[in-house]
């Protein structure tokens, strides 16, 4: 869907934990950058692209399966790679934001509920403070 909206494939970086699914993504989308590894260790997973900055991000790890400290670290790491105010869209499968807002650091707002996702998902938008 992202590519259908006109994003140049060479600008898209995807992080996938599963080696087999990462291989499948590379076959299906040869022009995008697929990084196989752990999003919770983004610096290591990005390798040569470790200093990469994002215009925005879409994140879908099942955060509610992880300790709060790990969730906060992931959200903070992603937001630190973006300009203040740019959106981080996080999929989640619970009724509440997987990481609450942090005054002075980031805000969170409920964006949408996606029934077509299996299981149905809520979308949350996180933004770094300071804009």
Model-derived segments and their meaning:
Residues 72-84:
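A short glycine-rich, Lys/Arg-flanked "PGG" loop and its adjoining helix->strand segment in the class I
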Residues 45-56:
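A short acidic, Gly/Pro-enriched loop at the edge of an enzyme's catalytic core
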Residues 54-70:
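A short SAM/SAH-binding and catalytic strip from SAM-dependent methyltransferases
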Residues 1-8:
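Conserved SAM-binding loop of SAM-dependent methyltransferases across substrates and taxa
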Residues 82-93:
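Conserved beta-strand signature within the Rossmann-like core of class I S-adenosyl-L-methionine
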Residues 113-131:
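Core SAM-dependent methyltransferase catalytic element
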Residues 18-20, 38:
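Conserved SAM/SAH-binding beta-strand->alpha-helix loop
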Residues 25-26:
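Conserved SAM-binding loop
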